């Protein structure tokens, strides 16, 4: 018997690492379904958000069994830079994939001041996690990736394979150039 019908996990997952995976594994133990709210889901790539939402879905699912994959749902959250509008968007997207009268919770970890958004959903029961995998941050992982290194100690196998394949693309080369030039603008075209 599960404590929740749905647990919502909000993140950019750029890329999906072991602390993310550990959070989902905990969520799957406590909930029938896990809803991953993929942040920064607009169709633009830049060095902070190199992967499109559909690519992140593939990267994430590749790390789970078929039975687990059936229990993971995705919603795509576009950046709006207004907390009230953003919360409304997240709630609307989540309500679009849950059954009526479901018990919904929010799972996460208050790692730093950027985690304040976890307090914006008082109607969802909070499942607060202690520090996971030494509170690893994806920023230095992305930076190493742009230098050509995949830090395998921080990633599950499916992510490693995804990153390895993505390195072979023209998009990766463009992102790598942007990183070297410290250019945070969006790539012009979607590939």
Regions found by a protein language model. Name each.
Residues 1-191:
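Nucleotidyltransferase catalytic core that binds NTPs
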């Amino acid at each position: 018997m599960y404590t929740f019908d749905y647990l919502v996990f909000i993140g950019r997952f750029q890329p999906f690492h072991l602390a993310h995976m550990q959070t989902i594994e905990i969520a799957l133990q406590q909930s029938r379904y896990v809803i991953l709210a993929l942040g920064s889901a607009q169709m633009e790539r830049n060095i902070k958000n190199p992967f499109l939402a559909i690519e992140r879905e593939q990267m994430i699912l590749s790390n789970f069994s078929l039975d687990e994959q059936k229990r993971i749902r995705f919603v795509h959250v576009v950046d709006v830079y207004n907390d009230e509008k953003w919360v409304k968007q997240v709630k609307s997207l989540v309500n679009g994939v849950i059954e009526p009268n479901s018990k919904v919770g929010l799972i996460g970890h208050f790692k730093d001041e950027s985690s304040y958004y976890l307090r914006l959903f008082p109607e969802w029961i909070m499942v607060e996690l202690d520090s996971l995998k030494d509170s690893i941050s994806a920023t230095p992982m992305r930076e190493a990736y742009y230098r050509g290194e995949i830090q395998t100690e921080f990633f599950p196998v499916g992510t490693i394979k995804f990153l390895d394949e993505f390195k072979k693309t023209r998009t990766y080369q463009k992102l790598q150039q942007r990183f070297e030039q410290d250019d945070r603008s969006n790539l012009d075209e979607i590939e």
